[in-house]
UniProtKB/Swiss-Prot annotation:
EC code: 2.4.2.17
Domain notes per entry: Lacks the C-terminal regulatory region which is replaced by HisZ.
Pathway field: Amino-acid biosynthesis; L-histidine biosynthesis; L-histidine from 5-phospho-alpha-D-ribose 1-diphosphate: step 1/9
Subunit structure: Heteromultimer composed of HisG and HisZ subunits.
Source taxonomy: Bacteria, Pseudomonadati, Pseudomonadota, Betaproteobacteria, Burkholderiales
UniProt-listed Gene3D superfamilies: Periplasmic binding protein-like II (3.40.190.10)
Keywords: Amino-acid biosynthesis, ATP-binding, Cytoplasm, Glycosyltransferase, Histidine biosynthesis, Nucleotide-binding, Transferase
Protein's name in the database: ATP phosphoribosyltransferase
UniProt record similarity statement: Belongs to the ATP phosphoribosyltransferase family. Short subfamily.
PROSITE patterns (alphabetical): ATP_P_PHORIBOSYLTR (PS01316)
Reactions listed under catalytic activity: 1-(5-phospho-beta-D-ribosyl)-ATP + diphosphate = 5-phospho-alpha-D-ribose 1-diphosphate + ATP
Length: 217
């Protein structure tokens, strides 16, 4: 049995077409079912639903053999012991710095001001600003990032940006793009040795599905 760890939401929705192309159908709709372990039309493959931030942990410690996770989560939480064979090119977005309209971010950086930055990406933010030589105080938040500059909690935020519509709706502007993000396939190293044939077959199926999806774009 191969266990594939997925998270609900955009990654799950975006992976479904790739699964179908690979000949895999998930038998339950996670939006309608309370099940956390879902069967598939492949008797030797099941799906477990976990929080996005927990996918690397499940794969690393053997709760799942293989998983799909955003590059942001891998960079933030660490990916020790994980084999990363494939960028699936799904759930694309970016991590960016944003500030409230009217805040002169460029001037603050040039003057060497110490900025308060709210984010859930503390490690990524720390590395980014350190590389630029910008002095920051990082404030860890878990949601509603856009509120931080509007309430005076922070001068800037570092967060995922897709279309930018949420920033615009809250009178924030994107001032720096830190990196582009997409979802990657991750594999437990021990599982790869013990279940090499079925896991390699699954990786190859995903690779072919990605190539076919790219050809249609």
């Amino acid at each position: 049995m191969i266990t594939l760890a997925l998270s609900k939401g955009r990654i799950f929705d975006d992976i479904l077409p790739l699964l179908r192309t690979a000949g895999i159908e998930v038998l339950d709709d996670p939006e309608k079912s309370r099940k956390l372990i879902l069967g598939t039309n492949q008797p030797d493959l099941r799906v477990v639903l976990v929080r996005a931030t927990d996918v690397p942990t499940y794969v690393q410690y053997g709760g799942a053999d293989i998983g799909v996770v955003g590059k942001d989560t891998l960079l933030e939480s660490g990916s020790q012991g994980l084999y990363q064979p494939l960028d699936l090119q799904i759930a694309k977005c970016r991590i960016s710095v944003a500030v409230r309209q009217g805040f002169d971010y460029a001037a603050a950086v040039k003057q060497g001001s110490r900025l308060k930055v709210a984010t859930k990406y503390v490690a990524i933010s720390r590395d980014f600003f350190a590389t630029k030589g910008v002095h920051v105080d990082l404030i860890k938040l878990y949601g509603s990032m856009e509120l931080a500059p509007l309430t005076g909690l922070a001068d800037a935020i570092v967060d995922l940006v897709s279309t930018g519509s949420t920033l615009k709706a809250n009178h924030l502007i994107e001032v720096e793009r830190i990196m582009d993000i997409s979802s990657h396939l991750v594999v437990n190293q021990t599982a790869l040795k013990l279940k090499q044939a079925p896991i390699r077959k699954l990786i190859d199926a995903f690779s072919l599905a990605c190539a076919q999806a790219a050809a249609k774009q």
